[in-house]
Structure formats: structure tokens, C-alpha cells
Amino acid sequence: MELIEKHASFGGWQNVYRHYSQSLKCEMNVGVYLPPKAANEKLPVLYWLSGLTCNEQNFITKSGMQRYAAEHNIIVVAPDTSPRGSHVADADRYDLGQGAGFYLNATQAPWNEHYKMYDYIRNELPDLVMQHFPATTRKSISGHSMGGLGALVLALRNPDEYVSVSAFSPIVSPSQVPWGQQAFAAYLGENKDAWLDYDPVSLISQGQRVAEIMVDQGLSDDFYAEQLRTPNLEKICQEMNIKTLIRYHEGYDHSYYFVSSFIGEHIAYHANKLNMR
């Protein structure tokens, strides 16, 4: 992994690395925050998945998470949201193609050549982190919007791999809303059964489980009713007896002003779980 940015932050280092991804067949950037204690010991890892239009920079520059990661001794890994490059398929819209990988494995041309973000996040990236950084095997996952969707899907499908999961403003029923429907049709085809593998509410209804889900949702979020539908997740978790910590916040929108307001509580939540034995 090639170090391309290095910034001192709260006694640790906010770095950005570039590497070639075998899963995605392109060069990828990834942000890695190494707290002060990483200089002397192995630490657990929180993976952060960003939302539509984002890259590895949004979370590391806008959330203020470094203060809390340093306090709680957690490495934070923030990858890009899709494969990148002139040779990678793209679309002339913000919600499909580069910047909109949806954390799935595409099966349809031309997307299936590079869009294997599920494999990248689940397998390739953790292997690289273990190889190059002072990381323990204990990891958690979180994300925002499309990234919140990805975090929920990865945790629900691999409950033994992630200690805990949380999300900000996640797309909880992508097969039922425009963002998910158009992306799934392009990436996965018209067979809607395939869509359900990447739909958190559907996965829970099929019996997939995690110990607990933490979600924060702003009530002044322009996408709340049409695209996100957090109450769908709350309802299915109640029906399936999955413990939740779902909080609704008056006045907060879909932006990083919202994420930065509560990221400290999410990192504390994950730290508590990651440090349990």
C-alpha cells in the first residue's frame, strides 16, 4: 500500500493509502486513522462506508471522528464508495456508477467487470488491513446513507465477522425505493430475488440476525420518507426480536453536520462492544 497523505491528528495519524484492488481491478484510495496507541499495540478496527457521491475523503475530513477514535483506541478504515478510473464503467448520474457502488457484487454487464464492492469490503480490504496495520481480528462496521445500507447488509450476512453495526440515515429497504431499485436493476438485473440479498429489511425477514443495531436518523432529512424509510427497519426488528437503538433527531438533515453531531456516540458504542471479551 502506497502512502499518499499523512496528517497528524489527535496524537495519531490520519493517512490515505493507494493500492491496486484485485476484486475491483483498479487503483483504490482508502483512509486509515491510526490512534496514538497504534504505535505500540494492536487495536480493533471500525470500517466506515460512505454514501452516494462520496469518496474516501468525506468522512475523514468532515466527521471529526479522529478525536473519538483516539480516545477509544480504535483504528478507523474509510474506503472509497466504488471502483474508479477511466476504464471503469460509469453513468451520467450521481446515483449509479462511480461514487455509487452500493457495496454489492454486480452481475450484469458492464458493471460486473469492476463493481465487486461487497467482496472488497468483506474480504480484500480486511486482509490488507491485517497485513499492513497493527490491527486485531476484532472489527465493527458503520456507514451513512448508501454506506449505512452496506454496513447493515455486511453485518447481517456475516454476523460472526462483525462485533457490532451502526448506521446514519441508512437505506433500509432498497428494493422498495427509487435509489435501490434503479441501482439494483442496473447492477443485478431484473430478477428481484437477487435484490433481496442486499436489502436489510428483507434479510431480517428471512431470518438473518445480529445482536443489536444502532441507527441515527434526522427528521429534517429530505430523503427520509422516499428513500430511507427507517421505520421499516424498526418494525421488522421488533417483529423478529432484534434489539435496536434507533434514535430520531428533530431538525437534523442528511449531511455531515448530522454525522459529526453523533459520530462520537457511535464510536463509543463500537468501542464498548469491541473491547468486550
Swiss-Prot record:
GO terms for cellular component: cytosol. Keywords: Hydrolase, Serine esterase. One of its GO terms (molecular function) is carboxylic ester hydrolase activity. The active site is at S145, D221, H254. GO terms for biological process: formaldehyde catabolic process. It is an enzyme of class 3 (hydrolase). Its EC number is 3.1.2.12. It comes from the Bacteria. It catalyses: S-formylglutathione + H2O = formate + glutathione + H(+). InterPro entries: AB_hydrolase_fold, Esterase-like, S-formylglutathione_hydrol. Belongs to the esterase D family. Serine hydrolase involved in the detoxification of formaldehyde. Hydrolyzes S-formylglutathione to glutathione and formate. This is S-formylglutathione hydrolase FrmB. It comes from Escherichia coli O139:H28 (strain E24377A / ETEC). The gene is frmB.
